[in-house]
């Protein structure tokens, strides 16, 4: 009886500690460089595709749906098998799948930063540092963000649904942060919009979650085209 109680206490504490890791992984203070990217929003504003809060909300929903259809399969596949061989394979597939240089560079930049931070912060998971160190010298690894996010979540012991929901949360958070700095919506309006879009995001998650990398696809090719124009903007605040 005492052993069962002790086991329950240990499991409860482990679960609580995991929640702290989950929250830290989603905290905007984690220096992964997400603040430097607008997910194509800046280009959409300058090309007049987004010019009001209403346009912004529609744009964000399309971004979330495209992110879920294209990138959630890589998150899911990586967290299901969080090992170096699977990650390298998924990284290569995603590198061949991304169709514009701007989004590809943004993905590599954020992925590299996330892996560096995760290996330094979550020292209780030595495999993070081991996998990163073993891959740093390889010319065939691009360090794309989605597979690394899935790998980190898998090694931290996060469940599949929470990990995929977390990826969409990070996307929603960063796009709204960019919108605030681009003065399309204020901080209060962004918070209200985030809460409202969360309901739609859950529907998007249910539609696209638990798919293999081979099922990845784009649902909004126009977003991809617009983001690819980012490098041609005369003046810009964000890297993508």
From Swiss-Prot:
What GO molecular-function term can you cite, just one?
nickel cation binding
A single GO cellular-component term from the record reads:
urease activator complex
UniProt keyword Ribosomal protein, yes or no:
no
Q: So what family is this one in?
A: Belongs to the UreF family.
PANTHER family noted in UniProt:
UREASE ACCESSORY PROTEIN F
The UniProt subunit note reads as follows:
URED, UREF and UREG may form a complex that acts as a GTP-hydrolysis-dependent molecular chaperone, activating the urease apoprotein.
Protein name according to UniProt: Urease accessory protein F
Gene that encodes the chain: UREF
């Amino acid at each position: 009886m005492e052993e069962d109680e002790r086991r329950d206490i240990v499991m409860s504490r482990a679960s609580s500690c995991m929640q702290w890791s989950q929250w830290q992984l989603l905290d905007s203070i984690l220096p992964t460089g997400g603040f430097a990217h607008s997910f194509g929003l800046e280009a959409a504003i300058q090309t007049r595709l987004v010019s009001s809060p209403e346009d912004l909300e529609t744009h964000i929903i399309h971004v979330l749906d495209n992110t879920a259809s294209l990138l959630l399969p890589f998150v899911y596949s990586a967290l299901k098998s969080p090992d170096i061989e699977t990650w390298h394979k998924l990284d290569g597939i995603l590198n061949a799948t991304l169709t514009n240089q701007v989004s590809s560079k943004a993905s590599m930049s954020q992925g590299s930063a996330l892996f560096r931070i995760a290996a330094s912060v979550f020292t209780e998971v030595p495999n993070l540092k081991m996998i990163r160190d073993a891959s740093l010298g390889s010319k065939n690894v691009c360090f794309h963000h989605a597979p690394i996010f899935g790998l980190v979540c898998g090694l931290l012991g996060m469940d599949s649904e929470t990990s995929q929901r977390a990826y969409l949360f990070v996307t929603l958070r960063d796009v709204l942060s960019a919108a605030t700095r681009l003065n399309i919506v204020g901080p209060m309006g962004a918070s209200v919009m985030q809460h409202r879009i969360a309901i739609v995001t859950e529907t998007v998650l249910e539609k696209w979650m638990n798919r293999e990398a081979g099922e990845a696809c784009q649902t909004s090719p126009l977003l991809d085209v617009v983001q690819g124009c980012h490098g041609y903007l005369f003046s810009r605040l964000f890297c993508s």
